[in-house]
Design a protein with these regions (language model features):
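Flexible, solvent-exposed loop segments that connect beta-strands
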Residues: 31-42, 69-89, 116-120, 149
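Short glycine/proline- and aromatic-enriched beta-strand/turn motifs that initiate or cap beta-hairpins
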Residues: 18-60, 155-161
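Outer membrane beta-barrel transmembrane domains
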Residues: 101-129
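Outer-membrane beta-barrel strand-turn architecture
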Residues: 53-58, 98-104, 130-135, 144, ...
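Cleavable N-terminal export/targeting peptides
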Residues: 1-24
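Transmembrane beta-barrel strands of outer-membrane/channel proteins
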Residues: 27-33, 63-67, 96, 108-112, ...
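Outer-membrane beta-barrel "beta-signal"
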Residues: 24, 28, 105, 129-137, ...
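Residues that define the transmembrane beta-barrel architecture of outer-membrane proteins
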Residues: 21-23, 42-48, 86-92, 121-125, ...
Length: 162
């Protein structure tokens, strides 16, 4: 009886593992250089998180959740120095990517950035280009966060995928 149950179980588990070969996940770190008005009020940012992707031929679906920090600058306004606020942000992104060449891809993500300082949220829009060799994934991107203000930055993201 055990052999009768074990053989179908092994077959099903082998099929399931074969289907998951297009799935990857892992930690990432990123550096961010503010642009536009955001550059005038905040220092360079950094962050970390975890991401996942499902590869479907040349296309794929991506998702990530992380933490980012942008320190505030001291800005001279009129007769005094003003301390600009720092931002602690939890970005949640989903997107698509398309493999342009064996190791090069283009990516487009969207999502929500949650500002932990004041409990506000912003819409995320982020195009990027990346290279993935074995488990190392490096991406250059432009990211825009939009609510009643606009926060934009150039970013460099490095991930290890399992």
């Amino acid at each position: 009886m055990t052999k009768v149950l074990l053989i179908p179980l092994l077959f099903v588990s082998t099929v399931c593992v074969a289907q998951l070969k297009g799935f990857g996940f892992g930690p990432y770190v990123e550096a961010a250089w503010p642009s536009g008005d955001f550059k005038q009020s905040n220092k360079n940012g950094f962050g970390a998180g975890i991401g996942a992707d499902i590869r479907l031929g040349k296309a794929g679906v991506t998702g990530s959740v992380g933490y980012m920090y942008f320190g505030g600058k001291t800005v001279y306004t009129g007769n005094e120095n003003t301390e600009m606020p720092s931002y602690n942000v939890i970005p949640v992104r989903v997107g698509i990517k398309y493999r342009l060449a064996p190791a090069i891809y283009a990516k487009l993500e969207s999502g929500v950035a949650r500002f932990t300082n004041d409990k506000e949220s912003a819409l995320i829009f982020s195009p990027g280009l990346g290279i993935r060799i074995l488990g190392l994934d490096v991406q250059a991107k432009y990211e825009l966060w939009k609510n009643d203000q606009t926060f934009s930055f150039l970013g460099l993201k490095a991930a290890i995928n399992f």
